[in-house]
């Protein structure tokens, strides 16, 4: 994806660094866009945010593994009982290596990394990639989780898992969570999803991810879907884990 138009706003002194980052990803400043990528400073820390300027009440979308929701989930969440942990097959001493092929904001990957899995992340949208890269940079520098994050979460500088060599760069598990149109009225959808849908839309070519995922996966491919969605690529999984709103479809390597 090249030459993505979006408002580029720098609220810090390091405008040169911000401009270089944006140029690297082919981003072009569009003063008429209602979506903005913003470099700002909060409590002394520089971070990247995505804002929907025509709906300021939505707030900003950014990646934060250190504080807030993700810190709470790491400390007090379900741990190995989390649905994503069960879906990838964590059991006893077994901690699979994982490729998260549709990393997004990195939340499911973070749950797995915090449990001890080595997770490589792929994110093809340049703006989301920058948000994720920014969040990881701050997490790597954190006193409490920095060492674990550097060891267990790595963002690859590629846009698609097809760029990986299946014989040398595979993993035990390849995890897919493609964007899917929401059924609910937009007001009921979480702010991240509302902003993301304006930025990305649904992954209309998501069906094309399953085959390369199965090539890279040494043990299983896992696909997270809304409970009302069809199977990816209309391919029936070996089995599924059902949660309140989602379904994890598991495709075993046979």
UniProtKB/Swiss-Prot annotation:
The keyword S-adenosyl-L-methionine applies. It catalyses: guanosine(1516) in 16S rRNA + S-adenosyl-L-methionine = N(2)-methylguanosine(1516) in 16S rRNA + S-adenosyl-L-homocysteine + H(+). InterPro entries: 16SrRNA_methylTrfase_J (IPR007536), SAM-dependent_MTases_sf (IPR029063). It comes from Histophilus somni (strain 129Pt) (Haemophilus somnus). GO terms for cellular component: cytoplasm. This is Ribosomal RNA small subunit methyltransferase J. Belongs to the methyltransferase superfamily. RsmJ family. Signal peptide: none annotated. S-adenosyl-L-methionine binds at residues 107-108, 123-124, 177.
């Amino acid at each position: 994806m090249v030459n993505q138009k979006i408002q580029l706003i720098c609220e810090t002194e390091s405008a040169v660094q911000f401009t270089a980052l944006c140029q690297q990803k082919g981003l072009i400043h569009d003063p008429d866009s209602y979506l903005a990528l913003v470099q700002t400073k909060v409590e002394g820390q520089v971070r990247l945010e995505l804002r929907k300027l025509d709906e300021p009440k939505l707030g900003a979308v950014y990646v934060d593994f250190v504080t807030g929701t993700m810190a709470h989930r790491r400390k007090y969440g379900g741990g190995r009982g989390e649905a994503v942990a069960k879906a990838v097959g964590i059991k006893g001493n077994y901690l699979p290596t994982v490729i998260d092929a549709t990393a997004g904001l990195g939340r499911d990957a973070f749950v797995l990394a915090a449990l001890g899995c080595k997770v490589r992340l792929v994110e093809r949208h340049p703006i989301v990639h920058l948000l994720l890269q920014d969040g990881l940079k701050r997490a790597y520098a954190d006193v409490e989780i920095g060492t674990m994050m550097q060891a267990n979460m790595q963002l690859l500088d590629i846009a698609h898992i097809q760029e990986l060599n299946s014989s040398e760069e595979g993993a035990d598990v390849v995890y897919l969570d493609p964007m899917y149109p929401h059924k609910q009225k937009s007001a009921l959808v979480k702010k991240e999803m509302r902003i993301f849908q304006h930025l990305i839309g649904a992954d209309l070519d998501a069906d094309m991810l399953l085959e390369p995922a199965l090539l890279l996966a040494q043990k299983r491919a896992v696909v997270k879907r809304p409970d009302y969605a069809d199977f990816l690529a209309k391919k029936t999984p070996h089995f599924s884990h059902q949660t309140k709103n989602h379904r994890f479809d598991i495709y075993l390597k046979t």
